[in-house]
From Swiss-Prot:
It is an enzyme of class 2 (transferase). The keyword S-adenosyl-L-methionine applies. Protects M.rosea, which is an antibiotic-producing bacterium, against self-intoxication. The gene is grm. Belongs to the methyltransferase superfamily. Aminoglycoside resistance family. It comes from Micromonospora rosea. Keywords: Antibiotic resistance, Methyltransferase, rRNA processing, S-adenosyl-L-methionine, Transferase. It comes from the Bacteria. This is 16S rRNA (guanine(1405)-N(7))-methyltransferase. The keyword S-adenosyl-L-methionine applies. Specifically methylates the N(7) position of guanine 1405 in 16S rRNA. Confers resistance to aminoglycosides. It catalyses: guanosine(1405) in 16S rRNA + S-adenosyl-L-methionine = N(7)-methylguanosine(1405) in 16S rRNA + S-adenosyl-L-homocysteine. Its EC number is 2.1.1.179. S-adenosyl-L-methionine binds at F64, H102, M103, S104, R108, A133, D156, D182, L183, L198, Q207. The lineage of its organism: Bacteria, Bacillati, Actinomycetota, Actinomycetes, Micromonosporales. GO terms for biological process: response to antibiotic.
Length: 274
C-alpha cells in the first residue's frame, strides 16, 4: 500500500515532469507509473527520481520526436488547404510529411504501399481497426484501403498528439475514436476486428518485462498485427531481427495462436490469428 508520504513524492515528481514542455501532455498514468518505479530505484531521492523518470519517458516517447514540439496547428492548416482544394495528391504528400514528424512512422514512409498491401493480403478488411500506441500511424489510412464504414480506434500516451490525430482524421473523413491510453494501466477488452501494435512491444518490455505478451493476450481481437524494428534509431541492426524473432516466436509457440511472418523495410511483422 502506498503511503501518504509516497503519494506526496509522486505528486512532486509529476509536477516536476509536467513543467517540462516536452512531457507536459503525457498521460498522467504513465508519468505516475514511471515516477513510482523511479522513487523505488532512487531510494526516495526525489531529484534523482526526476532524472530517472525523464530518462524513462525519453526511452518510450521522447526519443521518437524532434527536439522541438511539432507544430500541429500549422500542419492542420496545410491539410485544410489540400482538402478544400480537393487535391488528393496534395493530401497524400501532406500525409507523408506529417508522418515524418515521428521517427517511428518516418522509417515506414518509404514502404507504405508495400507495408499495407502485404498486411491486408493476410488480414481481412476490418469494420473496427484499433491502433494501440499509434503515434502518427493513423495518418497512413489512405494506404490501408479501408471501407468508408470502418471505425479507426486510435490511442497513445500523448494528449497533444491524439488531439492532432483526431483532428486530422476528421478532415480526412475517417470515422474514428481517439483516446489517451497507457497500455500498462488501462483495460484493453473493447472488441475490435483487427488491432495494430506497431513497434510497441520493445517499449513495453523496457518498462515491464513480459508485458508485451500480456497485452497481446488481453487484447480483444481475433487478429493482431505486431511489428518490431530491425534497426535502431541510429540505423544499426545490433542483431535485432534475430533477437526479436527468436523471442517472439518462442513465446508464440507456447500459445494456441497461428502467426505469419513478414519483413518490409526495417520492420519485422507478425500477423497473429488468435
Amino acid at each position: 500500500m502506498t503511503t501518504s508520504t509516497g503519494d506526496d513524492r509522486i505528486d512532486q515528481l509529476q509536477q516536476a515532469i509536467t513543467k517540462s514542455r516536452r512531457y507536459q501532455t503525457v498521460a498522467p498514468a504513465t508519468v505516475r507509473r514511471l515516477a513510482r518505479a523511479a522513487l523505488v530505484a532512487s531510494r526516495g531521492d526525489v531529484p534523482d527520481a526526476v532524472k530517472r523518470t525523464k530518462r524513462g519517458l525519453h526511452e518510450i516517447y521522447g526519443a521518437f520526436l524532434p527536439p522541438s514540439a511539432p507544430n500541429y496547428t500549422a500542419l492542420l492548416r496545410h491539410l485544410d488547404s489540400a482538402v478544400e482544394a480537393g487535391d488528393d495528391e496534395a493530401v497524400v504528400r501532406w500525409d507523408r510529411r506529417a508522418m515524418s514528424v515521428h521517427m517511428s512512422t518516418r522509417e515506414r514512409v518509404p514502404h507504405l504501399d508495400e507495408f499495407y498491401r502485404e498486411i491486408f493480403r493476410h488480414v481481412p478488411r476490418p469494420n473496427t481497426l484499433r491502433d494501440l500506441a499509434c503515434g502518427l500511424n493513423p495518418l497512413a489510412v489512405p494506404w490501408m484501403g479501408l471501407s468508408d464504414e470502418t471505425v479507426y480506434v486510435a490511442s497513445d500516451i500523448d494528449a497533444r498528439l491524439m488531439d492532432f490525430v483526431g483532428a486530422a482524421l476528421t478532415r480526412l473523413g475517417v470515422a474514428h475514436r481517439t483516446s489517451v491510453v497507457d497500455l500498462l494501466e488501462a483495460r484493453l477488452d473493447e472488441p475490435a476486428d483487427v488491432t495494430l501494435l506497431l513497434k510497441t512491444l520493445p517499449c513495453l518490455e523496457t518498462q515491464q518485462r513480459g508485458s508485451g505478451w500480456e497485452v497481446i493476450d488481453i487484447v480483444n481481437s481475433p487478429i493482431i498485427v505486431v511489428t518490431f524494428p530491425t534497426k535502431s534509431l541510429g540505423q544499426r541492426s545490433k542483431g535485432m531481427f534475430q533477437n526479436y524473432s527468436q523471442s517472439f516466436e518462442s513465446q508464440a509457440s507456447e500459445r494456441s495462436c497461428r502467426i505469419q511472418r513478414l519483413e518490409i523495410g526495417n520492420e519485422l511483422i507478425y500477423v497473429i490469428h488468435k
